[in-house]
Design a protein with these regions (language model features):
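Active-site beta-strand-loop-beta-strand hairpin of nuclease catalytic cores
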Residues: 143-155
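A short acidic/basic microdomain associated with nuclease active sites
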Residues: 117-145
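Domain-level recognition of nuclease-like catalytic cores that cleave nucleotide substrates
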Residues: 200-247
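Loop/turn elements at helix/coil->beta-strand transitions in domains of secreted/extracellular proteins
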Residues: 148-151, 196-200, 227-228
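Ser/Thr-rich, Pro/Gly/Ala-heavy low-complexity intrinsically disordered linkers and tails
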Residues: 1-42
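A structural signal for short, well-ordered beta-strand segments and their strand-loop junctions
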Residues: 125, 152-154, 203
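Catalytic cores of nucleic-acid endonucleases
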Residues: 156-220
Length: 247
């Protein structure tokens, strides 16, 4: 286990406000915001969230170019489910209470959503099993709304096992390529009722080294595979192993 990065306990344990519905070249999202006085983001919640917050607007949400966003999430203690669900946003708590379509990634999916809810005020529209598709095939993990635009979100993790091993560029490139191709497939399959404007690929990244490999992999990916995807990398610190363990 890496050494614990101690941050304000209030940020880890205060109750968050509810989040309610309401080309060429890569888009470079706006600079770090922690917090933004105009929008009040990031919202309080479980873990100290910082980095590029409140940065997704029409150029990123509707444009034909890909974009990349970096955030950090630091935990003073591990998440205790279900006792800590009240510390999540309404959508995050709903995700924790709803089975996904299989696998062991429920916590990482919930905290990837928390980043969107706390930074971009994104209400959860549908969970993985609620999204409707026209044909059987690749699916995405959740459907959210950002500034009135439906955005599909696929979630994955950048981590090497056993914990502490370096995350290789080869591993980063292989997984990133596969996930981007899956995004194109699920976009082709989704029903008209649930059709999103575009998709985001949300990574929970084990450490700064893993994130560096992701950045290198992203820069080398064929633009045709990137498409218009928004890559969101949330690097986690502190007592975060619960996000990367099989649950």
């Amino acid at each position: 286990m890496r050494s614990l990065v101690v941050v304000g306990l209030l940020a880890a344990c205060s109750s968050p406000a509810d989040v309610t519905p309401d080309a060429t070249g890569e888009v470079d999202a706006a600079s770090d915001a922690s917090p933004d006085a105009a929008t009040g983001v990031p919202l309080a919640g479980f873990g100290d969230l910082a980095g590029m917050c409140g940065v997704l607007a029409d150029p990123e949400l509707t444009g034909a170019s890909p974009a990349i966003v970096h955030a950090t999430l630091t935990f003073t203690r591990r998440f205790d489910d279900p006792a800590d669900r009240p510390l999540l946003t309404t959508g995050g708590a709903r995700m924790m209470a709803t089975p996904n379509a299989g696998g062991s990634s429920g916590l990482s999916e919930a905290f990837a959503y928390e980043q969107l809810a706390r930074c971009e005020l994104a209400p959860l529209l549908k969970t993985e099993t609620e999204i409707v598709y026209d044909t059987t095939g690749k699916i995405t993990d959740l459907l959210v709304s950002i500034d009135g635009h439906k955005i599909g979100v696929s979630v994955t993790r950048a981590v090497a096992y056993p914990f502490g091993q370096p995350y290789t560029l080869s591993s980063a490139t292989t997984l990133l390529t596969r996930k981007l191709e899956d995004i194109q497939a699920s976009t082709a399959n989704v029903s008209a009722a649930d059709r999103w404007q575009k998709q985001a690929l949300a990574y929970m990244s084990w450490d700064d080294q893993s994130t560096a490999m992701l950045d290198m992999a992203w820069s080398s990916i064929d633009p045709a595979i990137k498409g218009d995807t928004i890559l969101i990398i949330t690097t986690t610190h502190g007592d975060d192993q619960f996000l990367y363990s099989n649950m």
